[in-house]
Swiss-Prot record:
<feature type="transmembrane region" description="Helical">
    <location>
        <begin position="57"/>
        <end position="77"/>
    </location>
</feature>
<keyword id="KW-0138">CF(0)</keyword>
<keyword id="KW-0812">Transmembrane</keyword>
<dbReference type="InterPro" id="IPR000568">
    <property type="entry name" value="ATP_synth_F0_asu"/>
</dbReference>
<keyword id="KW-0375">Hydrogen ion transport</keyword>
<dbReference type="InterPro" id="IPR035908">
    <property type="entry name" value="F0_ATP_A_sf"/>
</dbReference>
<dbReference type="GO" id="GO:0046933">
    <property type="term" value="F:proton-transporting ATP synthase activity, rotational mechanism"/>
</dbReference>
<dbReference type="GO" id="GO:0005886">
    <property type="term" value="C:plasma membrane"/>
</dbReference>
<keyword id="KW-0813">Transport</keyword>
<keyword id="KW-0066">ATP synthesis</keyword>
<dbReference type="InterPro" id="IPR045082">
    <property type="entry name" value="ATP_syn_F0_a_bact/chloroplast"/>
</dbReference>
<feature type="transmembrane region" description="Helical">
    <location>
        <begin position="35"/>
        <end position="55"/>
    </location>
</feature>
<keyword id="KW-0406">Ion transport</keyword>
<keyword id="KW-0472">Membrane</keyword>
<keyword id="KW-1133">Transmembrane helix</keyword>
<dbReference type="Pfam" id="PF00119">
    <property type="entry name" value="ATP-synt_A"/>
</dbReference>
<keyword id="KW-1003">Cell membrane</keyword>
Length: 78
């Protein structure tokens, strides 16, 4: 159970970070392939970075809360 909790926390965090980076790459590719080139990707990237910072802080909060819940269950069992 201890290993599973650690593994699920790690995989959840990895999946969210990886998904954000993949969407960033797709946005850059979409923006630079258009008529405006790199200028067309600038505004969507700024918006996506702000959204990514919000999601990152939310993920950190969820990670900390889940870790506290897992630890509380362990302390409660003894």
């Amino acid at each position: 159970e201890e290993f599973a909790n650690t593994l699920t926390l790690g995989m959840r965090l990895f999946g969210n970070v990886y998904a954000k980076e993949m969407l960033m790459i797709l946005l850059v590719g979409l923006g630079t392939s258009g008529f405006l080139g790199a200028f067309g990707a600038f505004l969507p990237l700024i918006v996506w970075q702000a959204f990514g910072m919000f999601i990152g802080s939310l993920q950190a909060f969820i990670f900390a809360m889940l870790a506290m819940v897992y630890m509380a269950h362990k302390v409660e069992a003894h």
